[in-house]
């Protein structure tokens, strides 16, 4: 009997789009990447967009402007998504004047307008981060 390897040799992981790539992990501005991708070919999109908190890597804008900008990104993601594809959209909270706004609730109408259906909602509760107490 021949022994099988514990882990199979993984498929190559690319950092730029290629029609032959089965796995692409892109780190950067999605708008720079998405223009390269043909319509309807992506089966799974996993992303964690900026939360509009005004961190050093993002500019803080009004929540309406933020959602408008993200809607343009979502529109392009829907364009490249295959008919049997899924989007996993990981977001946190937007905070303004001490009030917490769960971003997933604000995004829901945007996804619905683009014909997508919510299939699952996962809430990760943890005791550290932006709003944790000591």
Predicted stretch roles:
Residues 1-134:
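Core catalytic lobe of class I
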């Amino acid at each position: 009997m021949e022994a099988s390897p514990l882990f199979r040799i993984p498929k190559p992981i690319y950092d730029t789009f290629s029609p032959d790539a089965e796995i692409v992990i892109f780190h950067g501005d999605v708008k720079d990447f998405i223009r390269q991708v043909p319509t309807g070919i992506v089966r799974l999109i996993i992303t964690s967009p900026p939360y509009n908190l005004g961190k050093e890597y993002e500019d803080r804008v009004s929540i309406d402007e933020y959602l408008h900008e993200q809607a343009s990104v979502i529109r392009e993601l829907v364009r490249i998504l295959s008919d049997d594809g899924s989007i996993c959209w990981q977001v946190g909270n937007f905070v303004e004047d001490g009030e917490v706004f769960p971003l997933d609730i604000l995004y829901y109408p945007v996804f619905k307008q683009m014909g997508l259906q919510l299939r699952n909602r996962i809430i990760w509760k943890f005791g550290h981060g932006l709003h944790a107490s000591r």
